[in-house]
C-alpha cells in the first residue's frame, strides 16, 4: 500500500512545523482550481503516528506491506525559483515544498515532520512489524532539492549535508552548465551537463556521492 506520508493522516499535530519557513512558509499552501476545487502544495501534517494509528484500515484492505515516501530531511522553506505552480500545472516548482520527501538535503537525518515523541523511525517499523506489516522505503539517490533560478539563494536548496550537518555540496543557485567541479569542491557532487528542471542532479560517477 503506497503512502505519501504527509498526505495520509495527521496523527500528531505537535510535529506539524506550522510556523516553519519564515518569509516562505511551508504549511498548508492551497492552489485554487476550477469549480471551487483546490489543491495544496504545502505540508499538511501526515506523519508516522498517522500510519501506525491506521494499520488496521490498511490490513483490512488486504495489504501486508506499506511503501512510504522518503523520510530524509527536506528544505524548511517553500521554493522561490522556477515557474509559479498553478492548478494542474507540471514542472512548475515555485511555491512548492518538500512534503513528498523527494527533495533531500541531508540523507542521514530524519525529516522533522515525521517522528513523534517516543516514535522515531525504529519505533515506527517496530509498530508495523508487530502488526505483521512490512515497511518498504522509497529511496532517491538520483537528485537532491531544486537548486537554481531562485531570486536569492535560499537555505538548504541545492545543498547536501553530511551526517554531522556539515555542508558538503552546494549548487549555489547556479544552473548545471555553470558549475565548476574542477575548481569548486562544493560542485563536485553534481552533474554539470544535464538538467532536471531545477533539481540538483547527483553525479553518480563521484565515489563520494
Predicted segments, located by residue:
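Substrate-binding/active-site clefts of carbohydrate-active enzymes
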Residues: 6-209
Amino acid at each position: 500500500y503506497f503512502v505519501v506520508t504527509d498526505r495520509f493522516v495527521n496523527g500528531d499535530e505537535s510535529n506539524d512545523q506550522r510556523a516553519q519557513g519564515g518569509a516562505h512558509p511551508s504549511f498548508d499552501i492551497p492552489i485554487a482550481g476550477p469549480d471551487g476545487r483546490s489543491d495544496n502544495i504545502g505540508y499538511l501534517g501526515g506523519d508516522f503516528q498517522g500510519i501506525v494509528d491506521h494499520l488496521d484500515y490498511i490490513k483490512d484492505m488486504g495489504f501486508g506491506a506499506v511503501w512510504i515516501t522518503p523520510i530524509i530531511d527536506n528544505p524548511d522553506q517553500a521554493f522561490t525559483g522556477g515557474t509559479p505552480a498553478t492548478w494542474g500545472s507540471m514542472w512548475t516548482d515555485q511555491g512548492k515544498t518538500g512534503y513528498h520527501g523527494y527533495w533531500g538535503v541531508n540523507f542521514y537525518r530524519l525529516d522533522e515532520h515525521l517522528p513523534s515523541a517516543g516514535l522515531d523511525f525504529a519505533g515506527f517499523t517496530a509498530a508495523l512489524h508487530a502488526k505483521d506489516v512490512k515497511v518498504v522505503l522509497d529511496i532517491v539517490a538520483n537528485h537532491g532539492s531544486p537548486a537554481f533560478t531562485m531570486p536569492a539563494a535560499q537555505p538548504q536548496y541545492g545543498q547536501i549535508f553530511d551526517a554531522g550537518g556539515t555542508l558538503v555540496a552546494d549548487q549555489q543557485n547556479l544552473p548545471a552548465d555553470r558549475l565548476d567541479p574542477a575548481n569548486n569542491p562544493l560542485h563536485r557532487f553534481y552533474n554539470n551537463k544535464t538538467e532536471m528542471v531545477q533539481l540538483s542532479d547527483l553525479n553518480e560517477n563521484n565515489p563520494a556521492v
